[in-house]
Structures are given as C-alpha cells and as structure tokens.
Amino acid sequence: MASSLKKLITSFLLFFFYTIIVASSEPSCRRYKSIISFGDSIADTGNYLHLSDVNHPPQAAFLPYGETFFSVPTGRDSDGRLIIDFIAEFLGLPYVPPYFGSQNVSFEQGVNFAVYGATALDRAFFIEKGIVSDFTNVSLSVQLNTFKQILPTLCASSSRDCREMLGDSLILMGESGGNDYNYPFFEDKSINEIKELTPLIIKAISDAIVDLIDLGGKTFLVPGSFPVGCSAAYLTLFQTAKEKDYDPLTGCLPWLNDFGKHHDEQLKTEIRRLRKLYPHVNIMYADYYNSLYRLYQKPTKYGFKNRPLAACCGVGGQYNFTIGEECGYEGVGYCQNPSEYINWDGYHITEAAHQKMAHGILNGPYATPAFNWSCLDAASVDNESSFGS
C-alpha cells in the first residue's frame, strides 16, 4: 500500500514538474508597447534617405518608390510598406520612425536604426579584405552603439525605466547580414571565400542580441536570409544558358538559394544556443526564406503573376533589370500593377510580397517559436485578415 502511494506521489510530482517546464518553455502573450529595429534596407523606413548626400540622394528618394501606399517616396526600398510596417499595424503601433533625420518625433512607441546597405560586420573588416562596401558605414555595431547613446533620452521621455522599456518592446534584428554577402558576390568572390564570412556574421548578430539582453531586452525577432537566387539582380548577374542550372518549378538559381540555407542553419544553431543561456528571453527565428520562397513556388495561389521573377520597376533583359539603370533613375519605367509582382526593383520585393511574408511570420508558420496572441482581444487578432494568407 505504502509502495503504491509512493509511486502515485512520484508520478504526480513528475507530471507537475513536466507541466511547469513545458509551460515555461512556451512564449507568453505580450502586449508590445514599442518596436526597436536594427538592420538594412529590408527594415529601413528612411534612415539612409536622411544620411545621404543631399546632392546625391538615393534611388528610394524618387517615385515610383512609395507610390502604392504612401504616394510619396519615404526612403523605403519598395513601392509601399515593409514587413516592419505590417508588424506595427498588427500591434496597433505607429509606423516605426527612422532615428536619423527625425525631428520633433516621439520614439516612445518605436525607433528604427536600420540603414540601407548596412552590414553585420564593420566597414573596417571589408576594407581590410579589399571588398567595397561604401554605401554606408552604419554597421550593426554602429547602430547598436547609437541606440545605447540615446537610450537614457528614450527612457527619460517615457514613464518606464530603461529595462522596463526594453522588456516591453519587440526587438527586430534585421534582416542583418545580407549585404555582407551581397558585396563580395557582386565583386565575383568565390563562394568558398564568402562562406568563410558566415560564422563572423552570425557572431556579430549574436553579440548584438546579448548586448540588448543585458540592457533588458526580452523579446527578439531574428530574421534569416532571403532566397536571393530568385531576385532579378542575382538572376541577371549569374545568368547562364544552361537550363539545368535553374529550378524547373520556380526558375530560381538553386545554388544561390542553398547558400542562404547555409546561413540560416548556422543562425538557427546560434539562436538555440542563446535560448539555453537565456531561458527567460524569447528569441524567435523568423523564416524569411520560406515565407518568401512559397510565393515563387505557387505565385498564382497568392495573387501574383506566373513565374514572377522579373522586376516590376526596371529596364532591360529577361528579368527587367540592368545594373546602372535601376529603378528610380530617370527614364526607367515600372509596371502598372505592382501587387501582381514579387520582385520590385531587382534587389527588393513589393509591398504585396511583404504583406504575405508578414502574415506568415505573425500568424504562422514562419516564426519559431510562434507568437502567442492569446491575450489580445478578438478585434485585434482579426486585423490579420487584411494581410491575406
């Protein structure tokens, strides 16, 4: 009898502790009060526009950039909204303002340090390697240091202390690292040379996350890479007459997409390591690759043209893209219906594609672990219906 009772108590305790462990491993629902963003053009809401020489403004300073939603150029590298904009809409927050160049703007509900052309690794690294990366010197570490410098000011304008403010924020870490690969690829470096950068890039992203955790960050969304083998720029740069070099379903270049997967696998491994070190922090992996690649696999299912590899805005060649005659330059045309296209300017994607990606990340299955929206009211969650699926 005593033995049976002992077994029963032991079983109960095991079940009890298992329940606690499982519950603690699942992300709790949070009502985020702000978005803090780092990265490159994938998330840049206007920083590069303000950092540029006024006599040599970037292409995103001109129409048709911004025409679909904002009706004017905002510095976003798309015809309209980006993933970060759709995340802000879903959370009921204002669009995240760029830090650089903003005047009389409140950063209490968000601030964005992402800059077009930015790298995860510092500019000095590329100079030493003989790789040109002269779009900007605002690398991930520079963005983070800028954030640290202004953090006391951000906290002073809020009723919350600094750790509480970061704890209530969704911290978007990019995409970061894409340009670290773009520059050497466009200088015709070998793929083995470029692969050597991956551990360094992953470490730079990881170090930034750890710094932000030390400051009080509790929720991170860490994007992986894009399937660049489907971008008009890469398809043009590495165009070949060999049919076997292309994916028969999508028309993309598999070897380039495999490189993106190589990066993502290492990033996911590092995120798993960080989760073990910081079990109280929710570090979500955003699968940008598959969230976008599905659109290339079944374009008509998602409202896009069949085989939508050509850029909407551009000129020349099979993919409507020519280096030196890109979107935003005088005389370069653009399509009448950007919502039917995935590729926008050869490097970036359209608002319609961003919208589909954002839906897949916020509502699954492209965030790991998935967001928990159980504490939001039904009306808030219903807002996702505007994303499409």
Swiss-Prot record:
Q: Name one GO molecular function term.
A: sinapine esterase activity
Activity regulation reads: Inhibited by PMSF.
Tell me which residues this entry annotates as catalytic.
Answer: 41 (nucleophile), 345, 348
| Catalyzed reaction equations | O-sinapoylcholine + H2O = (E)-sinapate + choline + H(+)
Tissue expression summary: Expressed in most tissues or organs of the mature seedlings. Not expressed in roots of mature seedlings.
Q: What class of enzyme is it?
A: hydrolase
Q: Which UniProt keywords apply?
A: Glycoprotein, Hydrolase, Secreted, Signal
Glycosylation site positions: 104, 137, 320, 372, 383
Q: Chief subcellular site?
A: secreted
Q: Write down the Gene3D superfamilies for this protein, in alphabetical order.
A: SGNH hydrolase (3.40.50.1110)
Cellular component aspect of the GO annotation? extracellular region
Q: Which InterPro entries match?
A: GDSL, SGNH_hydro_sf, SGNH_plant_lipase-like
Q: Which domain of life is it from?
A: Eukaryota
Q: What is its EC number?
A: 3.1.1.49
- Signal peptide residue numbers: 1-25
Subcellular localization, per the record? Secreted
Any extra detail in the entry? Overexpression in seeds induces a strong decrease of sinapine levels together with an increase of choline. Seeds display higher weight, size and water content and a fraction of seeds display morphological alterations, characterized by large cavities near the embryonic tissue. Seed quality parameters, such as fiber and glucosinolate levels, and agronomically important traits, such as oil and protein contents, differ only slightly, except that amounts of hemicellulose and cellulose are higher. Seedlings are larger and young seedlings exhibit longer hypocotyls.
**Functional note:** Sinapine esterase that catalyzes that hydrolysis of sinapine, releasing choline and sinapate. Sinapine (O-sinapoylcholine) is the predominant phenolic compound in a complex group of sinapate esters in seeds of oilseed rape (B.napus). Sinapine has antinutritive activity and prevents the use of seed protein for food and feed. Shows broad substrate specificity towards various other choline esters, including phosphatidylcholine.
Q: Member of which family?
A: Belongs to the 'GDSL' lipolytic enzyme family.
Q: Write down what this protein is called.
A: Sinapine esterase
